[in-house]
């Protein structure tokens, strides 16, 4: 069986959707099936490869809008050549990650035209933060239109949490169920066995630690968390991640680990 995962964001970009897709794909391979991940092009990475986990990856040309946070499909000869290679492989099932990327809209509609069964997994609990002005209004309108186009394919929607499922009601969608993020107990145990003493390594003494792990982008709230922690005596914020807010947080956080 060949399962194709469409994820506009994917490793080595750090984030929840990226690891979620990777875990699904590698478990697909481990179960004896074939996994294909279709994602966005990144500098210095091949447009097509099979990685060490046996996952076949296609990286489509995009415009890296919003510093890469919102990659937009870039039509052209390379795009059409790569997508032709994907569709010729007789996919048995498609999984579309998130509802609002241009790749998500394209993938859902293309799979529908080819009669390939699919589902959509949404990870969000709100609109992409773009402010309350004209830009924000345009962004919200785009999300509504994009979601309507994906919904029109008839694909079932799932949320990664109850909150994500509730958010789908904003677009007139009742989630078919929840597909939560999962932890691999064996991998976690192995990593924990060799974990360094971060309190000693970062020279934090006996201060209380607030830990943030995730992409350093406004919608994840790391900046707001840093402001709140700064008002608490004897408390330090340790952030692990990377993204556009990295320098902003580095100026505030006592210790910053990427």
Range-by-range predicted roles:
Residues 19, 208-231, 244-247:
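A conserved mid-protein helix/loop that constitutes part of the nucleotide-sugar donor-binding site
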Residues 6-8, 160, 182, 212-214, ...:
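Short hydrophobic "strand-cap" motifs at the C-terminus of beta-strands
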Residues 247-258:
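Nucleotide-activated donor-binding/catalytic signature segment of Leloir-type glycosyltransferases, i.e.
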Residues 52, 61-94, 98, 102-109, ...:
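An amphipathic, basic-hydrophobic alpha-helix
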Residues 41, 163, 182:
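Carbohydrate-associated surface elements
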Residues 1-45, 49-59, 116, 230:
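N-terminal subdomain of nucleotide-sugar transferases
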Residues 189-204, 209:
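A short helix/loop element that forms part of the nucleotide-sugar donor recognition site in Leloir-type
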Residues 117-119, 126-149, 153, 158-159, ...:
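Nucleotide-sugar donor phosphate/pyrophosphate-binding loop at the beta->alpha transition
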